[in-house]
Amino acid sequence: MAPFRSIYEKDATKKLVVGAALLVLAAFYSYVFLLTLAPVYGSTPSHIFHGYGVGIAGVAGWFSKDIVDRVSGRKAIYAIPVLAFFLPVVQYFVSQQSSALGNPAGPIFTEVLALYPLVLLSVACAGKLVQAGLNLQRHGDLVAEHIPLLGSYVIYSAGEHLIKAFLSRFIGSTVLLSRAGLQILIAIFYAAAVPSKALLLAIPAFLFSVTSNTHLPLGHTTTALNNIIADDGFALVARQDSTTGYISVLDNLEDGFRVMRCDHSLLGGQWIKKRPNYTPPAVKDPIYAVFTMLEAVRLVETAHGIPRADAGSNALVIGLGIGTTPGALISHGIDTTIVEIDPVVHKYALQYFDLPENHTPIIEDARAFVQRSRNAPQPKQYDYIVHDVFTGGAEPVELFTYEFISGLHALLKDDGVIAINYAGDISLYSTALSIRTIKSIFPTCRLFREAAAPEIGPDFTNMVIFCTKSRGAPITFRDPVPEDFLGSRFRSRYLVPKHEVDAAQFDNVGLEDGPQGHGRRVLVDKEVGRLHKYQDRSALEHWGIMRTVLPDRVWEGW
């Protein structure tokens, strides 16, 4: 193979192509590495310091490029493909210490150990190649240094946009386009850009990745993963990378429940254990009471006092999860439309959680659907709307803005009812802001939490907000009848909301004088970025809670 010196001394086009390739591949790997952290640490916590760290590594690489070139004898570029092959191996073993490392220390430590050196070397070597290829010394040192710097930044940024756009459509479609598969694929591209005999050193890492890395969704690696988590009483039923995260279905073989996982969170679960003399309900019981509480949207009495018949009623459900709530609505004979952004979530709900097929699925971003629907010449309106969106440990704040909730208001019939599930720390400003936004649009609301408030510690909970358009009549629930329970003892206990929360307690949170004051009364689209720090805190709390729900090895093995 040609040594680096000969590559460096070839024509300008060759230098620029290899330099640009290194920058683009570094951008690819940076984004993919972030995706691979999400199943272990959650998507939001993994983002907290990622951008800063990659930026520092890139800047350090650029300004140390001459030192790297001199100290390595122009051989540093050989190490880049080898390092790229070893990154999944390092990450695999470090992820097994995630509980000890904690969050957000775990993502930081993993990236410092693996990703940042790759970014630093890629930028350093690419910088030398781009400078040599452009050969702007005749225009002075200022031009010779800054034009390649700006050009490198543009190329890297273009790589980021390219990989995000590509994966938004194709992630998970093949093994090589899974998260772990992409790490191997990018390493192969690195090797193609910089071929050398040093690649022989990467053979052990490559062999480990394709034979023993349980993160790679192959038949034998899945079997190995099941052997590992079997000691904790779990079995992997299905898994696939998708647009919203790493989606998997897991069975708890001891307690008898099945869950759907999205990254480091659960979209829901249901009991599957069959007991003697037990008649299963029409819709399987969920493991979380909040999904049954959402079904109470049917129990809200109309302002005119006439009971609403299920037959002839229709419902719009924003966010599917495993399909507990929409499944119940369908079982009651309600014409149900489900809007779900992730096609794999919808597929798994049908295949593994008995979601009835007699519904209207809309696989689309809810914001686009609501905007298009409300702007239609004759917008379709619904008797019931259920807003239940939660992935990765943090609420998608874009679906709690004044604009989005106003869109749902336009799609709700005048005597209709909306139920909104909000999961988060009830003490945070972001929670109060979301509640105030909802109340500013719907004049009559009642709030209920899933369980009683804890005496000490963080107050992370699921909360359901029931609202109507009526300004006069308060929200009341009719007494349930046996048919409402769908043959379920669980529903007979949890269908009717019990733990009411005084909505007034959120009226002034964040609006007071002082360091925590001067907040906004409602959330609008252009200001969603103001809530990121609150999302970070809520996601970190959620991570700790999730570690008590499933064993560490289940989260780490993915």
Swiss-Prot record:
Subcellular location per the Swiss-Prot or TrEMBL entry: Endoplasmic reticulum membrane
Domain of life of the organism encoding this protein: Eukaryota
Listed GO CC annotations: endoplasmic reticulum membrane
Known outcome of mutating residue 340 to A: Abolishes catalytic activity
Predominant location category: endoplasmic reticulum
Phenotype when the gene is knocked out: Abolished N-terminal histidine methylation on the lytic polysaccharide monooxygenases (LPMOs).
Segments on the Cytoplasmic face: 1-15, 66-77, 132-145, 195-197
Any one of the GO BP annotations: methylation
SUPFAM superfamilies: S-adenosyl-L-methionine-dependent methyltransferases
Lumenal side: 33-49, 97-104, 170-172, 216-558
Reaction catalysed by this enzyme: L-histidyl-[protein] + S-adenosyl-L-methionine = N(tele)-methyl-L-histidyl-[protein] + S-adenosyl-L-homocysteine + H(+)
Topology with respect to the bilayer: Multi-pass membrane protein
GO MF: methyltransferase activity
Keywords associated with the record: Endoplasmic reticulum, Membrane, Methyltransferase, Transferase, Transmembrane, Transmembrane helix
Transmembrane segments: 16-32, 50-65, 78-96, 105-131, 146-169, 173-194, 198-215
Role summary: Protein-histidine N-methyltransferase that specifically mediates 3-methylhistidine (tele-methylhistidine) methylation at 'His-1', which protects the side-chain from oxidative damage. Methylates lytic polysaccharide monooxygenases (LPMOs) destined for secretion, including AN4702.
Recorded domain comment: Contains an N-terminal seven-transmembrane domain with little structural similarities compared to known membrane proteins and which is required for the NHMTs specific activity in the context of N-terminal histidine methylation of secreted LPMOs.
Family: Belongs to the methyltransferase superfamily.
NCBIfam families linked to this entry: MFS_SpdSyn
Protein name: N-terminal histidine N-methyltransferase
Source species of the chain: Emericella nidulans (strain FGSC A4 / ATCC 38163 / CBS 112.46 / NRRL 194 / M139)
